[in-house]
């Protein structure tokens, strides 16, 4: 296999921010009178789109307007908690430089909403280097389906078989 492109997940892969997401979710759940997530629930929901998470948390289908309100509430908590606290994982700068030097294309594939993606990349100082981003709301099916990674490969103009994904 010749690697011509690399696709990275964002949260927990490029930036060590999963504890901040967990704290934001815990605060959200408490405010909404919901029981805390246990480890199995966190693992099952981790990496999924808000549109897939909230119906499961509330145990019912939710109209789009309500989904937006819930997602905005949770994600604004994350952005407030993470302000001034994000940096790339150790070794990422070196890895990106190596990929750039070898002409290997790079993209981000994330379930995060647009405002969080902009915030996280900017706070971590990665926005300039990682400008090709595919979000979960841009593909028919969220993770764990491969749609987001296939879309990233297509946007880079590279066959999926020539891509390496870090999730």
What are these model-derived regions, one by one?
Residues 2-10, 14-93, 98-102, 115:
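N-terminal helical cap/lid subdomain that shapes the substrate entry/recognition surface
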Residues 8, 166-167:
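Active-site flanking residues adjacent to catalytic metal/cofactor-binding acidic residues
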Residues 18-21, 53, 75, 120, ...:
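Residue-level signal for functionally critical sites in structured catalytic/ligand-binding pockets
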């Amino acid at each position: 296999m010749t690697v011509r492109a690399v696709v990275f997940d964002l949260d927990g892969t490029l930036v060590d921010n999963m504890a901040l997401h967990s704290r934001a979710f815990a605060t959200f759940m408490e405010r909404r009178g919901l029981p805390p997530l246990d480890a199995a629930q966190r693992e099952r929901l981790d990496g999924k789109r808000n549109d897939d998470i909230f119906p499961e948390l509330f145990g019912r289908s939710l109209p789009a307007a309500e989904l937006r309100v819930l997602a905005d509430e949770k994600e604004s908590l994350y952005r407030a908690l993470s302000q001034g606290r994000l940096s790339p994982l150790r070794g990422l700068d070196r890895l990106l430089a190596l990929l750039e030097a070898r002409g290997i294309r790079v993209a981000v594939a994330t379930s995060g909403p647009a405002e969080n993606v902009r915030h996280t990349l900017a706070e971590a100082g990665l926005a300039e280097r990682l400008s090709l981003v595919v979000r979960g709301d841009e593909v028919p099916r969220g993770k764990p389906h491969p749609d987001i990674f296939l879309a990233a490969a297509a946007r880079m103009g590279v066959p999926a078989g020539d891509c390496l994904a870090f999730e």
